[in-house]
Amino acid sequence: MQKLEKQYHIHCAEGDVGRYVILPGDPGRCEKIAELFDDAHFVSQNREYTIYTGTLLGEKVSVCSTGIGGPSASIAMEELHNIGADTFIRVGTCGGIELDVRSGDVVVANGAIRFEHTSREYAPIEYPAVANFEVTTALVQAAKALGKRTQVGVVQCKDAFYGQHSPERMPVSYELLNKWEAWKRLHVKASEMESAALFVVADALNCRCGSCFHVVWNQEREKAGLDQDMSEDTTSAVQVGVEALKRLIQADRAAQ
């Protein structure tokens, strides 16, 4: 591909973003996250990619939305890495699977099921989608320090949102329903759409990536008749992601 002054999709060049980047899916969430940075400013917006840059503890940091799913998320990571980013935290939403995962919880993923296809263009299916240990540790410590109810474990990643939520009407319903039962028996915490791709792409780029999510709903709790309310306030997950970045910055400085 022809070399461009700015990255083709995110419209950023070297110096526009920090080494540390938070990756929400929703462009509308970027400004909210940037408000927790110091000296934050708008950088660019193109397609699903909205970017702000600021500082934390004096270190340049950024937030870049990815849109929905692995394809657009992998593009964001590739292009951010091209201009100097190497540490990523996905902060997003998920739906609970295991019964003790409740609306409003924060889920930290230590691995992801590759029930999607972007990662298959980076690594064979036998290769696991595993979160970076340093980033995961920072997320867990941040959640505990902030007093958030937190779940740590494997998440399932898919390409089709309605394949999960309306599997019975799909021509491949037998596969979707059987695999969903397998995820339940394996005590998978939640379902979302980006982490499997991001973890594998990060490994291919020799970067660090972890994920934390706000639980919106748990359809298995609903089926079981357990109490829950839909929760769309992502503040807790955002706070955990930002606090984790601070801890990573401090740890990286101490290791120098």
Enumerate the predicted regions with their spans.
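Glycine-rich beta-alpha junction loops
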Residues: 27, 95, 156-162, 197, ...
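Generic non-transmembrane alpha-helical segments
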Residues: 138-146, 201, 240-251
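His/Asp/Glu-rich mid-to-C-terminal helical/loop segments that flank catalytic regions of hydrolases
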Residues: 219-256
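Zn-dependent metallopeptidase/amidohydrolase metal-coordination segment
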Residues: 196-230
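Short acidic/polar active-site loop segments enriched in Thr and Asp
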Residues: 86-87, 189, 208
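Metabolite-binding pocket within alpha/beta catalytic cores that recognizes anionic/polar moieties
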Residues: 1-138
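Active-site rim beta-loop-alpha module in soluble metabolic enzymes
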Residues: 130-187
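Flexible, glycine/charged-enriched surface loops at secondary-structure junctions
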Residues: 40-45, 147-154, 250-256
